[in-house]
Amino acid sequence: MTTIKTSNLGFPRLGRKREWKKAIESYWAKKISKEELDQTLTDLHKENLLLQKYYHLDSIPVGDFSLYDHILDTSLLFNIIPERFQGRTIDDDLLFDIARGNKDHVASALIKWFNTNYHYIVPEWDNVEPKVSRNVLLDRFKYAQSLNVNAHPVIVGPITFVKLSKGGHQTFEEKVKTLLPLYKEVFESLIDAGAEYIQVDEPILVTDDSESYENITREAYDYFEKAGVAKKLVIQTYFERAHLKFLSSLPVGGLGLDFVHDNGYNLKQIEAGDFDKSKTLYAGIIDGRNVWASDIEAKKVLIDKLLAHTNELVIQPSSSLLHVPVSLDDETLDTSVGEGLSFATEKLDELDALRRLFNQNDSVKYDKLKARYERFQNQSFKNLDYDFESVRTSRQSPFAQRIEQQQKRLNLPDLPTTTIGSFPQSREVRKYRADWKNKRITDEAYETFLKNEIARWIKIQEDIGLDVLVHGEFERNDMVEFFGEKLQGFLVTKFGWVQSYGSRAVKPPIIYGDVKWTAPLTVDETVYAQSLTDKPVKGMLTGPVTILNWSFERVDLPRKVVQDQIALAINEEVLALEAAGIKVIQVDEPALREGLPLRSEYHEQYLKDAVLSFKLATSSVRDETQIHTHMCYSQFGQIIHAIHDLDADVISIETSRSHGDLIKDFEDINYDLGIGLGVYDIHSPRIPTKEEITTAINRSLQQIDRSLFWVNPDCGLKTRKEEEVKDALTVLVNAVKAKRQE
């Protein structure tokens, strides 16, 4: 009888209660020493390794743990240091400065990791001298060995690493070839240290362009074969289907495939005989991106099918578990929903149950998980009927007519200024919210505090001279979780944190049932803020596409249906704000681009559904009500027409870290709606100069009609300190005032 093995691609860094985040931010704030930071993170890494060992994984990843981002780790490993940061010792402080910027230099670009909500730091190739310079991977592998952990090193592969990079005069192929001797050196050091195999992540090979990379991919892995290391390499792909026949022809020891998010194609390729049985198959059968418990019986059937076409089978999650929370152990959830959930730790338990069943004929754990899954499935979460047809999906008049009415009503100046929505969540804000949630203070005391904070920041905005104000979102812990707490059909966890970028953690709500608006969500705070000023105050909402993409979605209904349910709920809130006298309403869609499928054959339908959902949420307002939206930076070229089709009166886009790249996306489209391209980077504590903001404005006006252009920061200001915000916004307003005089 063929036995199976179990493995993992990566584990969450945050810790069960965000110990990782707290330690790093304490170090940045100079509250702990570097030695204390190192000890805390070493202890957390040890805890992660031993936890995975407890679930009897045959091999446990190292190299997934990082102080910020694994792509940035790889950049430092190979001395791919941005030119402005060169000449310094390559250490953790340099790593943090590249990621966050400092008073002298801007940070490197931050971009979504494929179609997830994780962000990586983009490697920069301008005037670099690649070499192996900081082999932290080897250190961490040796540390795992010291714990008697059977570990395998993890590194992003050369094809993916270079493709996710920017800058430099070399071609894509030349950059890959430059790195091959360096990868070889790293591989040899790991093999010499005892690595049985090395996990080489090449998710770029599941994208549309993967065929265009096949020649250089073959050349790269042929190089590793000639160097005598290829058989120790396992190429891992995830998030979509791969071209299996090509991958099987590469001279490596094993291949990892995603059998969850591949729409069934990878299994079809296996059954068609496209897999080279001399290799080990690493089968991603447990969903690494969602929190629902596996249909364990269906996974058994899948394993049986795979065993018929393989000689060596390793089962694993479909991707790194970085994208899900650590554990359910600390949650106190309603059993009706809780039984259907599985976080990172529970997913390891599912792997262990299958290993025991196949290798030891031990079905105790398997039977328990099977019964639990069946109990959850026997419940009904489809209880509501929806009348989608009765809601408008287009505005009453074209933009050219609407903008005249809006300008007459708002009376805004040339180059109007605004912010994206949130202001700093100080320790005091967080304490009051926690005290209120834990019933340590009364509703009245909390409401009084919120009103005082709103009033204080309305005055700050007026004193600075902004044109369209916001209430600051002090009542919100997160732009999606807040709505998850208030809309029917969502479940909010206590410790369900996942990493978004760097130390930024989010707690995605879980959509388990039909979504419904039952009462106003934001009206009281927005109306109060508007009562304090004659300037317009924006209502601030999160859009349906983003709420869905930044939640753990239910899987018993099509995405479009769930998305439209959310859209109807947001539409109710939009109309409630309008009825309360709010003249400008922002419905943010920062996650619209990141949800774009990796394969272009699915793009058109995704974008069509996204545009319709946004219009369901926003089109019922009167012409004189101005609808804004906001998006985070990514490669917008693929969706620029869909952005236009949203028909938002104003869109603001995070652009400063793109170093002007986004402007190119507007060269091929006559964008005739209002737009604000972020003029400074809010992810960095660095205060922009007046000259930098003026340059950003001038660059934008080369492509965008001045009468349509707004000036704003990149994103919400929640994570910045109060003085940083006031100083940066003052510079922004002064730059705009000077520009108006030209």
Swiss-Prot record:
5-methyltetrahydropteroyltri-L-glutamate binds at residues 18-21, 112, 550, 594. It holds the Pfam family Meth_synt_1. GO terms for molecular function: 5-methyltetrahydropteroyltriglutamate-homocysteine S-methyltransferase activity; zinc ion binding. Pathway: Amino-acid biosynthesis; L-methionine biosynthesis via de novo pathway; L-methionine from L-homocysteine (MetE route): step 1/1. Binds 1 zinc ion per subunit. L-homocysteine binds at residues 420-422, 473, 588. Zn(2+) binds at residues 630, 632, 654, 715. Keywords: Amino-acid biosynthesis, Metal-binding, Methionine biosynthesis, Methyltransferase, Repeat, Transferase, Zinc. The keyword Acetylation does not apply. L-methionine binds at residues 420-422, 473, 588. It catalyses: 5-methyltetrahydropteroyltri-L-glutamate + L-homocysteine = tetrahydropteroyltri-L-glutamate + L-methionine. Its cofactor is Zn(2+). CDD domains: CIMS_C_terminal_like (cd03311), CIMS_N_terminal_like (cd03312). It comes from the Bacteria. Its EC number is 2.1.1.14. The active site is at 683 (proton donor). GO terms for biological process: methionine biosynthetic process; methylation. InterPro entries: Cbl-indep_Met_Synth_N, Cobalamin-indep_Met_synthase, Met_Synth_C/arc, UROD/MetE-like_sf. NCBIfam families: met_syn_B12ind, PRK05222.1. Belongs to the vitamin-B12 independent methionine synthase family. Catalyzes the transfer of a methyl group from 5-methyltetrahydrofolate to homocysteine resulting in methionine formation. HAMAP family: Meth_synth (MF_00172). This is 5-methyltetrahydropteroyltriglutamate--homocysteine methyltransferase. It comes from Staphylococcus aureus (strain MSSA476). The gene is metE.
